[in-house]
Amino acid sequence: MSDSFDRAPEQTKPQRAPPSSQDKIPQQNSESAMAKPQVVVAPVLMSKLSANAPEFYPSGYSSNYTESYEDGCEDYPTLSEYVQDFLNHLTEQPGSFETEIEQFAETLNGWVTTDDALQELVELIYQQATSIPNFSYMGARLCNYLSHHLTISPQSGNFRQLLLQRCRTEYEAKDQAAKGDEVTRKRFHAFVLFLGELYLNLEIKGTNGQVTRADILQVGLRELLNALFSNPMDDNLICAVKLLKLTGSVLEDTWKEKGKTDMEEIIQRIENVVLDANCSRDVKQMLLKLVELRSSNWGRVHATSTYREATPENDPNYFMNEPTFYTSDGVPFTAADPDYQEKYQELLEREDFFPDYEENGTDLSGAGDPYLDDIDDEMDPEIEEAYEKFCLESERKRKQ
């Protein structure tokens, strides 16, 4: 800190000014003439501040944390403690990612110089991303940044390669995990959603400089969906819905470009589950909403005018009814802001599918089971009517 924050100003004794003619009280009578002149002195408030007082920090401010990151990792005895402290900080203050990630990566480049250290770093980030539900998105962004800025590249593999190897270890146990006990399934679901975030955020630069997504993750997500639908328990199906809400539009676009019909097959699996599986009514309602969402192009608005495609330039209603988001500094922005269009679309696609549920499945409307509490005793009339039509249509198709 600067010297102005290190110590309080030194205190000096107030000096009394010598009396002047203006200080004397006028004589009123002969008796008062014999009185001594009175001097008016401005009152002095004696401060209790001390030059030796400790520095003041607002409540909730961690001076050790800030000093440690200003000084790098000197105050941390191990890499694990340094990284874990930073991960916890990002979990509590995700808005600090942009301002602190560069310094974090530079510090890691000076510390992570061996295969073992790189493996430890990958494991720490993986565990944080799969054990803290709200960190899966931030963890994926962190992985993407480090994959491009960590300089170490040992024979065992660089950061991205080791990360994908760690994910593959969990992926290979998908069939057992999907039918395991509740704790095993919960851990598996956290992995599935983290892999979905990785697919959206992990950028791979090609030889010509083009940026693409990891195709291996796309294949993995397809197989993970198969595992979830093959074991149609409520929590497995909820996980599948969340994954498709998160990645469905991107997956379908990619499959269509390759001439694949994987999304059609997935929707057929969902229809079979709605008709045949013994899942709860609320979960069936969620699945029907997902089918409806997909039929509307995953909620993406592609309005067209009579003669030409609608654009911000030719359609004054282009941005009507679009939601408003806010930056980490509280500045609002909409789809009409050119500086935030890419970020806006990303947030729009990440909007929670279930308005009464947090990302970790907690019901915001009240206490109880985060997944299985009934949202309502009965379906909404509109949903119930749609459900009946859906069942009749599916039955008709079967008989054909």
Swiss-Prot record:
Signal peptide: none annotated. Residues 361-400 are annotated as: PABPC1-interacting motif-1 (PAM1). Residues 78-296 are annotated as: PAIP1 middle domain (PAIP1M). GO terms for cellular component: cytosol; mCRD-mediated mRNA stability complex. GO terms for molecular function: RNA binding. It is found in: Cytoplasm. Only the PABPC1-interacting motif-1 (PAM1) stimulates translation initiation. This is Polyadenylate-binding protein-interacting protein 1. It comes from Mus musculus. The lineage of its organism: Eukaryota, Metazoa, Chordata, Craniata, Vertebrata. The gene is Paip1.
